[in-house]
Amino acid sequence: MSHAINYTQHKELSVEMNDFILSLPCSSPLCRRLDSPGCSRKSSNCQYQVSYGDGSFTFGDFSLETLTFRRAQVPRVALGCGHDNEGLFVGAAGLLGLGRGGLSFPTQAGTRFDNKFSYCLTDRTASTKPSSIVFGDSAVSRTARFTPIIINPKLDTFYYLELLGISVGGAPVRGISASLFRLDSTGNGGVIIDSGTSVTRLTRPAYVALRDAFRVGASHLKRAPEFSLFDTCYDLSGLPEVKVPTVVLHFRGADVSLPAANYLIPVDNSGRFCFAFAGTMSGLSIIGNIQQQGFRVVFDLAGSRVGFAPRGCA
């Protein structure tokens, strides 16, 4: 099986904030829920600091605010008012935490939105349409296929899913089994879905098996030099259409068939495309946002499940 693809973002979230922000005192119970709470000597206000894997960080006052999404207001949301934001934020006005942590937006405001939300990420390189996020019952797509959320008591901020296997070209990849993605009793291993990670990372044995299967299916394509973390690249310059093997992620209860643009991506202007997966020496695998593009990804926290609806950005 193969995809025929023609190679012929902006991501925004409109949130209004009140002019009045209530800074939290250092003695606030909310302040003590921060991983690394700080306290201003001048004002005795609670301060936060968060660092990210790419080296970016934000520092400022921990405050209460009313957020407005179009006509819906959500009062008394605890958030950080950043005074020092550095790194790869690329002009973003802020970050909305959507994880399972105690201070994430879904946790704080979940009951108002029936503990349901979904997003659809558009292709940054090919679409002028903005990405979207929906809260409430309307977030649940009728065409979504669902897989259960697995709880990791040792690390409860992430959404863990059960990945059973991967198919390439219509055949299960030999060497990939559910055991490579299993969450063990110590909280290690497993698979999470994360909108903040670009490229899907698989445990090294799973990645090597997937990569090798794809290389066999794409052996008719001209290879190109490696690029950054991508070790499987092709020279597609001058080709208006290319056939590549299909890639399907098999979650428990949900098979997710990826569009070709979600795993063979352009990395320069000379026609070089790379297989957009990578390996990791860690036991934790991550489903990144490139592989999520174009799907409406539904988080039904009330039902403890995550769903995938193809062509969900319409």
State the predicted function of each range.
Residues 1-77, 83:
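Signature of the N-terminal lobe/flap region of pepsin-like aspartyl proteases
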Residues 45, 51-161, 270-313:
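Aspartic protease core domain of the pepsin/retropepsin superfamily
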Residues 1-30, 67, 95-99, 181-221, ...:
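Aspartyl protease active-site motif detector
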